[in-house]
Regions:
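A short, basic N-terminal segment
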Residues: 1-41, 257, 261, 266
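Conserved NTP-binding/hydrolysis module of P-loop NTPases
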Residues: 10-13, 70-72, 80-99
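Walker A/P-loop nucleotide-binding motif
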Residues: 40-60
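Short regulatory helix/loop adjacent to the ATP-binding pocket of P-loop NTPases
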Residues: 62-65, 165-180
Length: 266
């Protein structure tokens, strides 16, 4: 695709293109809640639909933490077995992993205490895609990070995932863990006004100061994306591709409808 047709230096809607961060209301609120969690320590829960910006918010928040004060550990629950999770956590915290769960439990608590009390660093344990987490790990977490001799939390444990994670934690068996949440935030989609600003900011970031999508095209994209940044990016990208194939300099509503069908969103 020749993006120069649209006055763009590059395609700002591609995932692997130069990142142009658009700070929506939900993004800023998520960062505010995460910053509060970092200060207070304890358990936090961040949920939202697919493509709502959870990973972007968590990644940027974690990257901004002072490495002299925080030790960030990231785990993706969709790719790890229960035993792999515990061994990976021990190793990431600086310990020696074992094949025995009790040994890994002890090592995790020892390493958290060592970082907190000796190194004066707060472990920040990010459990991404935590909607895949099993009841076994959820039951373990409240025990694993319960330091009886110290009433204060020694680590930040962030569960990040889809909305069904909230439903899981509402089960009575998980009430003790839910009561320990010091932060619970669900990311909603963008408003239409934010969606328009999102598109404009992306175009500006790619060196384009004029309109690329006409009003009908913009409205169609906003309706189909339902406020989800990932879907909006995908639709804009596919619409540009369709418009380029038709040698259009301005994307119209018919082209967006073709893009919606191509993306199987219609």
């Amino acid at each position: 695709m020749e993006v120069s047709r649209f006055g763009l230096e590059f395609n700002p809607f591609l995932k692997n293109s130069k990142e142009i961060l658009v700070e929506t209301t939900q993004y800023r609120e998520a960062l505010f809640r995460l910053s509060y969690l970092a200060k207070t320590k304890g358990f936090g829960l961040l949920t939202g639909g697919p493509g709502r910006g959870k990973t972007t918010a968590v990644r940027n928040w974690a990257a901004a933490l002072n490495p002299s004060l925080y030790k960030v550990v990231y785990s993706c629950l969709s790719t790890l077995t229960v035993s792999d999770f515990y061994r990976s956590l021990v190793e990431s915290l600086g310990g020696q992993p074992s094949f025995r769960k009790p040994d890994n439990f002890r090592s995790i608590q020892e390493e958290v205490s060592r970082l907190c009390l000796e190194k004066k660093k707060t472990p920040v344990i990010i459990m991404d895609e935590a909607n895949y987490i099993g009841n076994a790990i959820l039951n373990d977490l409240k025990l694993l990070f319960n330091f009886e001799m110290d009433s204060r939390d020694r680590a930040v444990i962030l569960l990040c995932g889809l909305g069904q994670l909230n439903n899981t934690l509402r089960l009575s068996v998980h009430e003790p863990l839910r009561q320990r949440l010091v932060m619970n935030f669900h990311m909603e989609g963008m408003t239409k006004e934010e969606g328009r600003a999102f598109i404009r900011a992306k175009l500006d970031g790619a060196g384009c100061s004029h309109a690329v999508f006409d009003e009908g095209a913009t409205e169609a994209i906003l309706n189909a994306s339902d406020g989800t940044p990932r879907v909006l990016n995908r639709l804009c990208c596919q619409s540009l591709l369709c418009a380029d194939a038709k040698k259009l300099d301005l994307v119209d509503a018919d082209t967006v409808m073709q893009a919606i069908n191509d993306c199987e969103l219609g």
